[in-house]
């Protein structure tokens, strides 16, 4: 308990050797808060936190705040550095233990050729460059040590690469899954191991005083390494098995024994004359990597190390840094020269190794810029050099400045050179709507599913099941295109070391991941070909990675499946069905996650589809009304008598009815809301693939401006089959595609109207011509099961859909074999669909609709959001045309 108290008028921050805790707490709060504040602006530049911690230490030191009178005397007095250094060095030992666990020797073995080549080049050449510049830097020392020892230390500092910082930069730039990232990661591990060996050798030679003593120290260090790897490593594995730490979470006893080993190893390496951090590093390398054991251990200690211990260490380092000692032109000349030599030697050597590996110049430059990263490990080396007396304050400050600059420029340099790498999806685009019409019939032959969450996999399996049912029940004489299922699994990683460890073991993880294996088994049981990719991505900005993966797989369409939450939908009645809150409830977590993926949807150069589903069980379907007409009072009725009278003109609709008054229930009902946009064509193509099954039926609701002022009519008063739309009386289709005339037969119009009298009623607008063309390509069997319904406003559309889909029956049903899937296109501000939205928006607001300000709401548009909220329990497919599509008709 503290003997100082504010009630006694004591200065509680005065250092007391018997009770140093109060001042230590004040120091820790100031250091951590300042480092976090500095990191906020640097994070927007994608800079690692270590730069903020180094700068924070420099700011607290004599360079900046040390110039405030009495600041260092009261807050960081020399006498208080003992406890601060003790805690920070303990944290450093634990941090090196974590770094040791990052070193997966299996990666070195699998990529030994690449690792050996890049590691040797990236160490030998910078080592030689450091030896050259050390001749000039030696003049700034007191020359208490031999030049050879000084040369060895400077060369080690020049040749080392900060592997922990490097791994985080690779994660931020989404390079971990690429060949460039694999090469740099492997070389970084090799560089890290050799760098620590060189550092141990340097410290040994400095502390030995004689060559014979140095040999003894090295032999003891080698013996300790062999003892750990030969005797202790198998025992650690057996202990992990015995305590069930491999199968489950690491037990408390296992963690206690491992941390005790870290301290013992650090103690031994310190007393033999190397450094305690080397002992912690060695213990980290012997921890088994099976079943993510290193990840689980790291998760237990990394937050304490990264949030408390490391900032204290770098702050104590910054307190020793005095940039004001760089006060002459000659010193600044050597400082700039040191920075240039450090970057040029590291970058040039790594680039040369990459060129030997036959990598392109652009990728070679990326490898070189990444390997020039210094940062955290450099600071450790410099502090050891300062504590041993090899470096004085001037050279120490010079190299700290060099470490900050080289680490700071790593990310911008890498991003700059990445611009010159060939974009693998630049050519993956469709340039015009005419090209899309030709492209669509073959579109869904290779379906790519983006799976970010386990629930997404369930939704993808439901979509695949829909396709399988159609293929499985189709007539044997009908030729179907081969369908390949391609899944893209994303593994999100952040700056946490445990996540980076998990990412580095992704290949092993993919092979053993139960969900991925289950998904693959499901696809193969359905007799589809299967391909998959696992991507290591950070939380944001990974869209280019996905797009490049799509290009490599030659995908025709990207489908993003989402599983909606039934529990939230049950509570929907508490709010307006058109309110934004109801829409959020209908989509569940998909609403938020879709907002994060909007840039991917907008940037895609191939069609994109968003599939919403609730659960694998199908829904009840009300008895289908093949003809829905409107009476003069606006109420709907089934006009089977009129159907019989007009049987001659509506013989294609007759297939939907077995006999007068009967109901013929289809096993699958698919609905398309067609507003004449390119996005709707994407939805149309997927709808047609759902019609291979002979017992399925489709309703295509088309918007026609002719009815936009007909608000008195609650239901559409015109229903046509596709054959009517493709009749020769459709002047626009006849003029644009004369060949269609051969496949079209004359149809007499209903209700006694002559052709001339009724032609203005059923001629679709220009936006429907692509629909006509696509429907003319399908088989007679499919076309006969398509009914086209016109509507003039959103109210009439909703009324018709409510008649088709009975709201009271929208509950989970395990007995029916029926399902409903609705297909829509995203909003298109340049299309006629925008007019429908504008006309309906004011009316929707009166009914309680709150215009969505979300990214997804703006992209999807009013119509899909309203339909999603009105029919939350049916499946939805929302289509989006490629980015470079030329809009217009």
UniProtKB/Swiss-Prot annotation:
What does UniProt give as GO cellular component? plasma membrane
Q: Spell out where the chain crosses the membrane.
A: 12-32, 40-60, 81-101, 116-136, 147-167, 180-200, 215-235, 254-274, 277-297, 323-343, 365-385, 389-409, 858-878
- Where is the signal peptide, in residue numbers? none
Q: Which residues lie on this side of the membrane: Extracellular?
A: 1-11, 61-80, 137-146, 201-214, 275-276, 344-364, 410-857
Gene3D superfamilies noted in UniProt: 1.20.1530.20
Protein topology in the membrane: Multi-pass membrane protein
Q: Does the keyword rRNA-binding apply?
A: no
Q: Which InterPro entries match?
A: Cation/H_exchanger_TM (IPR006153), CPA2_transporter (IPR050794), Na+/solute_symporter_sf (IPR038770)
Keywords attached to this entry: Antiport, Ion transport, Membrane, Potassium, Potassium transport, Transmembrane, Transmembrane helix, Transport
GO biological process, alphabetically ordered: intracellular potassium ion homeostasis
The molecular function terms in GO held by this entry are: potassium:proton antiporter activity
Q: Which PANTHER family match?
A: CATION/H + ANTIPORTER (PTHR32468), K(+)_H(+) ANTIPORTER 1 (PTHR32468:SF0)
Q: What is the protein name given in its UniProt record?
A: K(+)/H(+) antiporter 1
Its source organism is Schizosaccharomyces pombe (strain 972 / ATCC 24843)
